[in-house]
Amino acid sequence: MNQLSAEMIKAGIVALAVFAGCAYDEPPPPAINVQQPAASLTGLLESVGARLSYRLDLPARHGKVPAVVIGHGSGRVTKDACRFLAAGFLARGFAALCYDKRGVGESTGEYSSVGPRNSDRMFEALGEDMAAGVRFLRSHDAIDEARIGLVGGSQAGWIIPVAAAKVKPAFMILLVGPTVSVGEEIFYSAIVEKTAAPLEDGYKRLPTVTGERGFDPRPLLETLDVPGLWLLGAKDRSIPTPETVMILDRLAAQGRPFSHVVFPEAGHDLSGSPYWEAIDRWLARTPTLGVALLGNTAVQRK
């Protein structure tokens, strides 16, 4: 058995730990004076093989409002895990839909940690859950069905393209979302996240990955015409940021409407980075979405 194969086996052994307890759960609290929702509605969403317990927070605005469906990172997470992202979008005039991950909290269905062998099946199911959220919002009287987006981080970076292919949202925002395969992410993080190895070691050795790759988002991303923003940390020890950027640049050169921002001092949690400012700038120049921010006094910088 060669050294690389041995490392891939080691990576497979730690895969459950990587995906069940990733350093990213959610970005830090938004740097805003957060308003409370004008209303919070709860209920159950029907998805394929699951019923999802949701909370829909609505802003204090007249008329139909834009909205986001917030997807989860790895682990057994509930709707409460997206509270900071929801608050940030609420302050920007968006409604925010959060839900318990399938098989977690009050949601039914199968929960499973994700690795290369089951990633295609699990991301199909989790993508269907996000798509169900979009379909629900499109039927809601308070929501502008033409301005519904998908938002999420880490593992959600794989799930969002699956959902986007199903329902064609108005936009997608992916925080520290990988564009490499599951197997490549595990290989990279096994080298640098669980050891003191320099990030450059992971970058240099990534092309030598062996073993199962599992889900790969690149074929889906090559087909998507959905405006997308990736927010990345240059010091991320979970996903290989340079490879992610290279893939996004290649896709943008092919005409995909994708942008990215790399924060030089940020890791996988984006802690200390001005990611909300980046989101604001991108939303303001994305057709039909910038209007959501106009005249919104809830967004006040500290």
What function would you assign to each model-found segment?
Residues 266-302:
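Catalytic active-site module of serine/aspartate enzymes centered on a nucleophile-bearing elbow/loop
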Residues 224, 230-232:
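Short beta-strand/loop motif that positions the catalytic acidic residue
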Residues 90-110:
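Conserved alpha/beta-hydrolase
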Residues 166-204:
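Hydrolase active-site cap/lid region
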Residues 118-140:
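Alpha/beta-hydrolase active-site loop
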Residues 27-61:
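N-terminal cap/lid segment of alpha/beta-hydrolase-fold proteins
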Residues 75-86, 101:
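The serine-hydrolase catalytic nucleophile loop
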